[in-house]
Amino acid sequence: GQYTPGVFTGKPLGGGGSEGRTEATGYGVIYTVREALKHLKMDSKKTVAAIEGFGNVAQYAAIGFVEQLGGKVACVSCWDRHDKKSYTYSHKQGVDPRFLLTIVDQYGTIDKKAAEEAGYVIEDGDAWITKEADVLIPAAIEGHVNAETTKKMSSRVKVVAEGANGPCTPEADEFFKANKIFNIPDFLCNAGGVTTSYFEQVQNDMNFYWTKNEVLEKLDTKMTN
């Protein structure tokens, strides 16, 4: 038989995986948000984001928003597998995503007690969409931004970046149009992961592997040019 490691992707690095694959979807979201803010002539360092979710995509979107764009993350949300409900976690000085990574389990459940001790305010899971923010990043569940939840959105919101698959319903799309909110659709916004899977196949075929910076630079170019 022939050795063809590129037939499936998302492999560990030792088995022919690609650097940057873990971060790719979340960082891809941020590359598209950066371009949207440029288009709208908004200073990313003065912007605030509210994020739904704290799985892989939301984690790296939060990190990217703070570390790459210089913005502030007002909140993230997560499903608490112990309480069987979702919560929103916010902090008056902005969420520290690197800290939250130290208190989240492998399933995306944030340690509620540790968060409270660190000064985080814990609210109902739907509270994320009500926050005073310039950018909303739904990165959790399909259809959560809909005719009902858009009524709770702050008038400050200028960008909705679809980190999840299908997080916004057609009714939400109509709301965005009516209120001049710039919507980055999921098939572009969250394409960083599948694009980097393609990069993984390319590297497998060449049997030559790029550094993380090389992968992420190529991803940025592919998504924004």
What is each stretch, according to the model?
Residues 20-23, 27-130:
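Glycine-rich phosphate/diphosphate-binding loop of Rossmann-like nucleotide-binding domains
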Residues 5, 48, 71-75, 134-135, ...:
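Structural motif
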Residues 1-17, 32:
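N-terminal ligand-binding/catalytic initiation module
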Residues 139, 154-225:
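Adenosine-phosphate binding glycine-rich loop
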Residues 57-61, 144-148, 168-170, 191-193:
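Short glycine/serine/threonine-rich phosphate/pyrophosphate-binding segments
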Residues 122-133, 143-160:
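Rossmann-fold NAD(P) dinucleotide-binding segment
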